[in-house]
């Protein structure tokens, strides 16, 4: 807000303000942007929430020094924020001395914070990364969130201040990065750590949307490696011929698994229902009858 617009081949002149336009995006990054004039609208916030919860996209909160992110707490996105923000410090906290992100026990073994397979080496890398002087005002993490890294110097009655935290939201994932200085990780090593971190974030967030994808249908399933007796939940995002989310469509599903003798195939129809919200999401569930490769076919005639 209040700065000149950019340009370029992939530049967006305006926010994709409809389900049809937004559904193509795997990850949304929100910097020093809130809800207000020249920024997001309340409807935009609701669309982002729907994209994450219904279609399994990712959302990254990256607050800045203007404090615009606090206005998001009066929007639909409040429920998705992994931390409780400190509204008494709208412009964040600045220190004279450099601080660093300190990995939590959860962060030491998480994919997003892994620069080396050896946890001890990885921990040393994080300690040596160029630090920061400014951070978002945060009180604590919210219930259901996982804290991957905390402020090396600041703490309150709740403990160390969480600056890197994640949480699930419906079918999607959300990440909060409470410092704007990750770009400094390029110092002396170019994009070795900076690029790797953000590429890991993007892949982690977009993973479920691309488990199976063909001809306007994306299929995701939980758990990804089911065992006999585990109930499997399927979500199919279906687009119409124009590439928009299919509403009130006829979506069919069939599950095929090998029979006990391994030669003859047996199949059943899946009972598929459309989820509310108009995001083109259709759901089904089943119990695996036996081990082995299972084939799932989803079609929208």
Where are these regions (language model features)?
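N-linked glycosylation sequons
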Residues: 1-301
């Amino acid at each position: 807000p209040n700065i000149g617009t950019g340009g370029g081949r992939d530049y967006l002149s305006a926010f994709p303000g409809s389900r049809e336009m937004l559904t193509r995006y795997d990850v949304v990054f929100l910097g020093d942007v809130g809800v207000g004039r020249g920024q997001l609208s309340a409807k935009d916030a609701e669309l982002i929430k729907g994209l994450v919860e219904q279609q399994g996209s990712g959302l990254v909160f990256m607050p800045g020094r203007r404090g615009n992110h606090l206005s998001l707490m009066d929007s639909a996105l409040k429920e998705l924020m992994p931390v409780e923000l400190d509204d008494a410090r709208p412009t964040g906290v600045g220190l004279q001395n450099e601080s660093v992100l300190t990995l939590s026990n959860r962060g030491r073994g998480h994919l997003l914070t892994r620069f080396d397979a050896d946890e001890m080496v990885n921990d040393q890398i994080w300690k040596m990364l160029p630090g920061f002087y400014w951070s978002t005002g945060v009180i604590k993490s919210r219930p259901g969130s996982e804290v991957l890294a905390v402020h090396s110097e600041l703490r309150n009655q709740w403990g160390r201040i969480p600056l890197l935290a994640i949480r699930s939201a419906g079918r999607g994932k959300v990440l909060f990065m409470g410092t704007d200085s990750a770009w400094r990780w390029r110092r002396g090593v170019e994009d070795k750590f900076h690029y790797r971190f953000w590429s890991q974030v993007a892949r982690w967030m977009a993973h479920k949307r691309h488990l199976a994808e063909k001809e306007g249908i994306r299929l995701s399933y939980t758990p990804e490696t089911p065992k006999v007796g585990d109930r499997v939940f399927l979500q199919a995002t279906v687009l119409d011929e124009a590439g928009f989310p299919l509403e009130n469509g006829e979506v069919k599903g069939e599950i095929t698994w090998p029979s006990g003798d391994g030669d003859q195939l047996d199949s059943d129809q899946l009972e598929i229902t459309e989820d509310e919200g108009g995001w083109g999401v259709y759901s089904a569930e089943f119990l695996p009858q036996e081990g082995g490769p299972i084939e799932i076919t989803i079609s929208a005639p």
